[in-house]
Regions:
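Active-site glycine-rich loop that binds ribose-phosphate moieties when present
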Residues: 29-54, 61-67
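C-terminal accessory domains and tails appended to enzymatic cores
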Residues: 100-179
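A broad structural signal for short, well-ordered beta-strand segments within beta-sheet-rich domains
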Residues: 30-33, 58, 121-126
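Active-site rim beta-loop-alpha module in soluble metabolic enzymes
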Residues: 53-58, 62-111
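Short beta-strand segments
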Residues: 6-11, 61-62, 130
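Short coil/turn connectors at secondary-structure junctions
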Residues: 1-5, 13, 54-57, 76-77, ...
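Short acidic, glycine/serine/threonine-rich loops at helix termini
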Residues: 17-21, 71-74, 141-142
Length: 179
């Protein structure tokens, strides 16, 4: 890859996270949870794995307090900036925009100096996608190579993270099509 690192700004915690501002996993009304190779992940963990597939480590994340904790589970060496702290799922105490902008700028500059390695992704990649209801899992179970685990969960095994991601997006779209 021609990139040294990736940086995520404006991120949120995975669905169901206590004190996660607007927490959801990709499609809040559709996806209950996502596990990659046995670990529950949100968008931070999923996107960091996609970057890692390309040899790029996650070096910086800005978001709410809960998301910065989630990011450190993905990559303990990451630089994070918390720009808001949850009062509830839909409310937060936020830094003033000028303060947040400066903190993000400083954090990103510090992260750019790091020499991090991308996380290792074990192949094949197994996804467990749990939907918010069985109708959505019914629709996604039509995707070739998926296996139904229970009423709301499908399993998808892929040779690498990119194929797994494409399968995940297909499952999200199938689940979303059910109203």
């Amino acid at each position: 890859s021609s990139y040294d690192a990736c940086m995520f700004v404006g991120y949120h915690a995975k669905k169901g996270t206590l004190e996660g501002v607007m927490s959801h996993t990709y499609s809040g009304g559709n996806i209950e949870s996502l596990h990659v190779n046995g670990m529950e992940v949100g968008e931070t963990g999923l996107n960091a794995r996609i970057a890692a597939h390309h040899g790029v480590p996650l070096a910086f994340l800005a978001g709410d307090v809960a998301t910065t904790k989630e990011a450190k589970e993905v990559n303990p060496g990451i630089v994070t900036v918390a720009v808001k702290d949850a009062i509830g799922r839909m409310s937060a105490k936020c830094l003033h925009p000028e303060v947040a902008r400066e903190e993000i700028r400083k954090g990103a500059a510090n992260a750019a100096r790091l020499k991090l390695k991308p996380m290792a992704i074990k192949a094949p990649v197994e996804l467990l996608i749990r939907f918010t209801d069985a109708r959505r899992a019914d629709a996604a179970a039509f995707i070739p190579t998926t296996e139904r685990v229970d009423g709301k969960t499908i399993r998808l095994v892929a040779p690498d993270m990119i194929v797994a991601y494409h399968g995940f997006i297909a499952a999200v779209l199938c689940g979303t099509a059910v109203s």
